Amino acid sequence: MDKLLELYQQAVDKMLCYFTPILLLFTRLWVASIFFKSGYLKITTWDSTLYLFEEEYQVPLVPWELAAYMGTAAELILPIFMVLGLFTRPMAAALFMVNVTAVISYPVLWEGGFYDHKLWGLMILLNVVWGAGVLSTDHLLKKRFFK
């Protein structure tokens, strides 16, 4: 029985060696796509974005105009780092905060879009906890400079 459990554990470990990097890459690309598209929409319809931040969104602690600039910049810049897998943990943590802020600031999301934000939050947290994995610039830099 011990031999069977050991073989099972070895098989699972081997499978995870291949599956985990693909999962981490998938989550990075998926979340980056969602947030970049959101930032792109904000910047291409800037007047509407300013209106929404002034009238609809209830961003705490930050003036609405600053929140519009910061939110749009974060949604355009952070996904680039996620795609590259560069400085993944801090960039993912920042993107997680953008996601949390979106949920807090726009209560209308709680009815229909909250599920999506929870899913994105979990995908982002995978990268905060595990890092970007071997399919990333972080891994290449680590191999190059921290042998």
Question: Across the structure, where does each feature detected by a protein language model lie?
Answer:
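Extended, low-polarity transmembrane helix blocks
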Residues: 1-44, 62-73, 77, 84-147
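Extracytosolic helix-loop segments that constitute the early lumenal/periplasmic catalytic or substrate-binding loops
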Residues: 45, 49
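Perimembrane loop-to-helix junctions flanking transmembrane segments
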Residues: 50-62
